[in-house]
């Protein structure tokens, strides 16, 4: 443990300071902006008119949309209850329209609009002219607007998304029979990209095999040097030109480690793919624990030296090799098994419409529990999440859309599926995080013809070492297995002993017993016993059947498998919504708000205690966590999760014992520490009936349960529990993970309210309703109609989603119980700040703030004197409440005696 780093954190917190925030970055249409005068990415998310229905003629430039709602993107068309499974979301056409006046300075430039994702099939018009029709929900749409724009006057972009069921494009399966939800809308970012008529193309805007944009790959990698190959596709829409292509590669510290210049002549209205290569000496290599990213600067100049295009890409120098029974080799060296989870992108209430910071926090929350591989179930993820995986050192299994469906009747379905294969590789080929290409629809009976073409197209798009395709290793696909590099299975496959194995989904215990009941599927509010059961199931699940011992795919099974199985992903990281089933999937180690369950700490026990200094926001520190609440309904056994060597458990000041967190009979590096039959509710009652609420040292020593984490014989961390007492107050936490909210009109910050006792213990068994209000440069998402505000406490928690305005500044969040009273818990307030966006926002109008409910005691027009008197009265009421509560406590003590 780095004690100096830990001490610095404590000192900074004591003096009200913060550690300097790591500046995470998000790509824009596949690049990072350097000089906006040459190539600029303009944030086009703010100020779209929207209506959730079909409207005839809404593509026309003069259509009257004045009564439509104004929204900011990403937008999912609607807000939904926490439990939104079973197809409760809207399916059908909707419309978005944006009015804008292009800057006169853009005359003569190329102007592209880049949609990161529109759900379903969609049509896009500019000034009444149809410019693109698209079929598919998860890939960018890159459209040239240059010839359609009118400068000096208002322009209108109209978009008609339609998320209705449609068998003709992937995933193809109707939502009501699908194990995830479509949701809808323009649910990812939109960018306006401007550059000159000589420019580096976008790989999805040009149909070039292994071409378009920038393509980087590596060869001859050692610790001493690596050969870097860079292909740059340049378009020239002007006169023939002699050009210079400049490359500069810089390391994390900004040191230039290589540079290169190449001359090329491109004819008028033509393009050229320029192939370049150079050697980097003593390269900083990318790996999960050391995710070094280099900056590749690409600059196009004319023969006079004028810059015509410039931007940068992030490059992670690494090679992967899968050697079947020998396992995974990263940068030429054997690498340990990878362990992680699948990820669906939907979030509580907002569906798929997550802003970039929420995507980043998703990746960060998983990385902070030690995960180093993610499977993108069952579609390609938002670029912000992919950027985070590159940055945080998380391998990724990239998947095309699909789930248990193949359209045999319409050939267009396979054509579009194969187009998705090419698009996925073109889009993500440069990412160091990409581990496998899942180019088949999940759990689907696809024809052999498709297997041949899908693997062939992948090889064509990535014709270099390090490309690995993957499919299921099931009997009905035995003919197709030979075409793929990797198989999904529990362990080595007898018929394919030389193939590498990956476990795509493990942990979920589905046998269709009474319609998908499973020990893995636990809603957090069900309590500690179900949560403990879920965690222990994920660790190891065995049972007897017909006289034979059966083992379900678990953490124990994964670590105990042969070297052929080089990685595995849990189903699933977060609770998420489903189409065909009315219950959400509750098997996540975190809920839909990304708040942890006990199983979260099972995974965190695999986090090392040092060695992650190069991973942003991730501290490899010792921890210990007691998965027990000391309630009258708590189990007798006490389970503790830790990444320390040993755990010492003390109860009521008496030592229970010391146990190791390792087991010579278990292949898992850390095991749950279980102290059996040590908790008795009568002891908790007797030890706490007097003096409770003082929270002084004497009481703490005599009343709590304490776990101490031990490394090399010394206590390095601890965690305490006590029986939660009377509800005293609400407590608020801004769950920003150290990622500063952006004032871009789209960012969402999670604020969690906890109901706690006098000492801060959370009252997990409470179910009051909590009402949130927001002041300043933010707005509360949702209200009564969508069951968001007020909100019932679940497991002692209520969560507010706060959307940033377009002005940087202070945001104040207040939480209070719905019904006031002399003995009601005290309200809570917390503040946080937003910072200005990194890109220019282009808009002409803003959404109106939703009308918030004003609590009765808060008078809208009250004077400063009245406000002062009201505050004083509240303080008097609070003191009176404390007095009464203490008197009640004394009476109870007397009665017990």
Whereabouts are the PLM-identified features?
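Non-catalytic, glycine-rich low-complexity segments
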Residues: 25-52, 67-103, 114-116, 158-239, ...
């Amino acid at each position: 443990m780095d004690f100096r780093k830990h001490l610095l954190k404590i000192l900074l917190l004591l003096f009200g300071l913060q550690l300097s925030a790591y500046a995470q970055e998000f790509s824009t249409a596949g690049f990072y902006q350097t000089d906006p005068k040459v190539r600029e990415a303009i944030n086009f998310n703010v100020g779209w008119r929207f209506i959730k229905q079909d409207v005839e003629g809404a593509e026309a430039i003069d259509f009257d949309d004045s009564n439509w709602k104004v929204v900011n993107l990403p937008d999912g068309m609607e807000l939904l209850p926490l439990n939104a499974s079973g197809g409760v979301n809207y399916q059908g056409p909707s419309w978005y329209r944006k009015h804008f006046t292009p800057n006169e300075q853009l005359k003569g430039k190329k102007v592209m609009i880049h949609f990161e994702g529109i759900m379903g099939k969609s049509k896009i018009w500019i000034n009444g002219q149809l410019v693109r029709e698209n079929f598919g929900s998860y890939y960018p749409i890159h459209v040239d607007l240059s010839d359609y724009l009118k400068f000096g006057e208002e322009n209108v972009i109209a978009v008609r998304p339609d998320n209705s069921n449609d068998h003709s494009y992937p995933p193809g399966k109707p939502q009501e029979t699908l194990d995830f939800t479509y949701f809808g809308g323009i649910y990812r970012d939109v960018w306006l990209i401007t550059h000159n008529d000589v420019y580096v193309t976008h790989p999805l805007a040009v149909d070039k095999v292994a071409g378009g944009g920038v393509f980087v790959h590596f060869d001859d990698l050692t610790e001493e040097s690596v050969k870097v190959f860079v292909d740059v596709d340049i378009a020239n829409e002007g006169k023939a030109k002699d050009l210079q292509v400049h490359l500069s590669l810089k390391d994390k510290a900004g040191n230039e480690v290589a540079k290169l210049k190449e001359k090329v002549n491109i004819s008028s209205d033509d393009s050229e793919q320029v192939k370049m290569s150079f050697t980097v000496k003593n390269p900083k290599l990318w790996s999960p624990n050391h995710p070094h990213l280099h900056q590749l600067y690409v600059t196009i100049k004319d023969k006079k030296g004028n810059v015509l295009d410039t931007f940068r890409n992030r490059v992670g120098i690494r090679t992967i090799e899968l050697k079947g029974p020998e396992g995974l080799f990263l940068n030429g060296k054997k690498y340990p098994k990878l362990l992680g989870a699948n990820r669906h992108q939907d979030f509580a209430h907002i569906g798929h419409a997550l802003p970039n910071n929420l995507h980043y926090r998703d990746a960060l929350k998983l990385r902070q529990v030690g995960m180093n591989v993610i499977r993108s179930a069952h579609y390609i993820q938002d670029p912000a999440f992919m950027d985070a995986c590159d940055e945080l050192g998380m391998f990724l299994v990239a998947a095309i859309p699909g789930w248990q469906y193949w359209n045999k009747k319409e050939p267009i379905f396979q054509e579009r599926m194969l187009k998705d294969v090419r698009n996925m590789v073109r889009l993500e080929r440069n990412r160091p995080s990409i581990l496998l290409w899942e180019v088949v629809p999940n759990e689907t009976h696809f024809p052999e013809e498709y297997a041949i073409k899908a693997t062939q197209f992948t090889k064509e798009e990535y014709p270099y070492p390090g490309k690995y395709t993957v499919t299921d290793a099931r009997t009905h696909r035995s003919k197709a297995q030979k075409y793929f590099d990797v198989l999904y299975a529990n362990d080595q496959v007898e018929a394919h002993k030389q193939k590498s194995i990956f476990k795509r989904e493990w942990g979920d215990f589905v046998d269709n017993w009474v319609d998908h009941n499973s020990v893995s599927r636990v809603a957090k509010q069900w309590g500690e016993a179900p949560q403990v059961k879920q965690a222990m199931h994920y660790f190891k699940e065995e049972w007897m059947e017909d006289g034979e011992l059966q083992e379900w795919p678990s953490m124990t099974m994964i670590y105990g498998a042969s070297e052929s199985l080089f990685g595995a992903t849990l189903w699933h990281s977060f609770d998420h919504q489903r189409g065909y089933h009315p219950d959400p999937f509750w098997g996540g180690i975190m809920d839909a708000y990304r708040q942890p369950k006990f199983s979260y700490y099972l995974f965190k026990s695999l986090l090392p205690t040092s060695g992650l200094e190069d991973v942003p926001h991730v501290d490899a520190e010792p921890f210990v966590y007691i998965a027990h609440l000391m309630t009258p309904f708590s189990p007798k056994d006490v389970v503790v999760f830790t990444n320390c060597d040993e755990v010492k458990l003390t109860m009521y000041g008496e030592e229970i014992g010391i146990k190791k967190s390792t087991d010579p009979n278990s292949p898992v590096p850390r095991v749950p520490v279980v102290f059996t039959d040590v908790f008795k509710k009568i002891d908790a009652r007797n030890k706490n009936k007097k003096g409770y609420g003082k929270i002084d040292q004497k009481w703490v020593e005599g009343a709590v349960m304490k776990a101490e984490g031990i490394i090399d014989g010394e206590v390095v961390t601890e965690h305490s529990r006590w029986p939660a007492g009377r509800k005293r107050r609400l407590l608020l936490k801004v769950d920003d993970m150290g990622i500063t909210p952006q004032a871009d009109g789209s960012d969402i910050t999670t604020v969690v309210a906890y109901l706690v006792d006098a000492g801060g213990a959370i009252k997990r068994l409470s179910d009051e309703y909590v009402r949130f209000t927001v002041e300043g440069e933010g707005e509360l998402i949702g209200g009564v109609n969508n069951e968001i505000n007020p909100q019932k406490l679940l497991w002692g928690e209520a969560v507010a989603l706060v959307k940033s305005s377009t002005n940087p500044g202070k945001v104040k969040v207040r939480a209070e119980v719905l019904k006031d009273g002399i003995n009601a818990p005290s309200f809570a307030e917390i503040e946080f700040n937003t910072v200005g966006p990194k890109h220019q926002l282009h808009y002409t109008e803003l959404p109106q703030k939703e009308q918030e409910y004003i609590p009765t005691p808060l008078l809208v027009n009250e004077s400063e004197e009245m406000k002062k008197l009201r505050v004083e009265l509240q303080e008097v009421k609070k003191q009176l409440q404390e007095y009464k509560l203490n008197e009640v406590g004394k009476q109870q003590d007397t009665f017990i005696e």
